Amino acid sequence: MKNQIKEIREAQLMSKAELARKAGVSPVTVDRLENGAECRMSTKRKIILALGLKLTDRNEVFPEDEW
């Protein structure tokens, strides 16, 4: 199942660059994640928090099978 990073980011009218800045990752990383690339657990946490979500909301962003 595909992650929901792009959908959540766009719903918040946030650019890839802004999400990357807030998460402390590169825009290339955000692009890769939005296209389904795997990443470290620490990167997932950064993305979730940068989207303004709680870590308990992780399944809204990343499907359970990715944890």
Regions found by a protein language model. Give the residues of each.
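Alpha-helical residues within the helix-turn-helix
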Residues: 10, 21, 49
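DNA major-groove recognition helix of helix-turn-helix/homeodomain DNA-binding modules
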Residues: 41-59
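Recognition helix of helix-turn-helix/homeodomain-like DNA-binding domains
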Residues: 24-39
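Conserved hydrophobic/aromatic packing and binding residues within compact polymer-binding modules
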Residues: 5, 19-20, 30-33
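A short, Lys/Arg-rich alpha-helix, primarily the initiator
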Residues: 1-11
